[in-house]
């Protein structure tokens, strides 16, 4: 019997694979389809109603800047600016499309997106009224920002009836600022009565009227910010605002509010910013205001407040900005103000404050950058302690009664950029300029109405090579300074605005003034200047082509009254100054150079009150930006160029008291100029003078010459025709 061999392995026998039946094929296909369907359903797909609402919204807006490229073939939760929640039906919760250049209207379909919690359409061009029921239907909305658009009309705030006043809304931040909205914000609003979670409410820069809606402090106890500024709100500030105990910001400036500031405001212990300027508020500043220990900014300027600055103002140790200017505040500056060591800006301009300033410890105000005490009645010398405020960039003491000289200690203010000391009783202009030229960052220097009857230093080497390296505005007007226009001014190669008016400068206008590369505003009026207008003056580069510059803002506004109008003109930016040449009331002779036509940027040209002769140059018509042209009280002759009617921006034109003749142009702006602006020219006619223009002998001769020449031409023509006819025969 044979035994089995050890290790013998049985061969593996495999059966052939049977093909799947048709039923099995169908089963597997169903499995694959269901799997794919499951995977598809598991991905976020936005709610169908929300999708349709978004499509409707997009159809109402357009943008050439950044159009909405919403691809309808993909899920709307993936569209730009759209966010959905994690629920199974993926509701839209956020629409965020700020600064997209969107124009059009806000579609009411947005109200159908019921779970919307944030809507931001700020900084666009949307217009029209807000849809009816807009606020109350979006009861899940927490953040609404429609600021910086052009929405108009009244707010669609439904009034409460029956139990509707018990509705509550989720809104926390509501910003409708910088639109064209109007009407009153009523206490009976269903929506505003139910905003129990509201933290920030901003309706600034609109046209709302009626009383400030202070009732919101009762319905919205969480309020932290209220901004009603730049509207037409009127009436008194309500005591109810004292209920907003969590308020940190209260802004209601630039309205028509009246009455006193209610004492309840001083219970707002969390308040950091109190902004109530440019109203009609009266009364005194209550000393209880010093209880607002967290206050960082207090702005009550441009009201009718009176009395003294609270003596305990120094208790506001967190104060960074104190602006009480343009009121009727009197007394002295409290010494405790030196305890406001965080103060950065102090503006008490245009009040009735007085006394000396030497006792105030300015040395404690090391953060102070801007100090404006102008237009008060402060006396004595410019306090040396000010020069220990090392951070100062701008100082104004204009319109006071300060005496003495400028101290060399001013050089310790290494960041000083703006100095306005006009209309005081300062002396020694030579010493002042010798010192101040060392202020390396000084860009604005206004010393007008000081140094009476002194002689200005004139030599070119008076100014060191690095003196006034950044000076852009220089004013010494109305000082009655003697001498010639100083030669050292040629070294002010950064100067853009120069006022030398109302002095006693003699001699001719130096041609080198026309070489100052950035000069675009020059006032030489009311001096004793003689000679002719230099041609070089009309080659000022900054008046020939527009210059684009940075650092346009001034640290403090500048006030000018060049035409003796009732109010000063305020300039907050350097390039708010109109490109100007004033050379009024001097003793200039000769003609107006034709080179004047090169100054195409010029807005104002006034040469009145001189002895200029010759004709009005036709080249003036090249000054297409010209707004004022005054050539009155000279000896100009000839006619008024008709080409001046092409000056479309010309709003003032005066040629009275010259020797002009002929018709006054009757096109363009010339029909709007008053009769008085042409009087004193006996031979002028027509236009607003309503006198007929008789043809002059020269014109009659011209007509005869034209007739004679026309006759000769016709004779030649007829002779030529006769010759042709004869030849044809």
UniProtKB/Swiss-Prot annotation:
Residues 45-82 are annotated as: N-cap. The keyword Protein transport does not apply. It comes from the Eukaryota. The chain crosses the membrane at residues 708-728. It is a single-pass type I membrane protein. Residues 690-707 are annotated as: C-cap/acidic domain. LRR repeats lie at residues 89-113, 114-137, 139-163, 168-193, 195-219, 220-244, 245-268, 269-292, 293-316, 317-340, 342-364, 365-389, 391-413, 414-437, 439-464, 468-492, 493-515, 516-540, 542-560, 561-584, 599-623, 624-647, 649-672. Residues 45-707 are extracellular. Keywords: Cell membrane, Glycoprotein, Leucine-rich repeat, Membrane, Repeat, Signal, Transmembrane, Transmembrane helix. GO terms for biological process: meristem maintenance. Pfam families: LRR_1, LRRNT_2. InterPro entries: Leu-rich_rpt, Leu-rich_rpt_typical-subtyp, LRR_dom_sf, LRR_N_plant-typ, Plant_LRR-RLKs. Belongs to the RLP family. This is Receptor-like protein 2. It comes from Arabidopsis thaliana. The gene is RLP2.
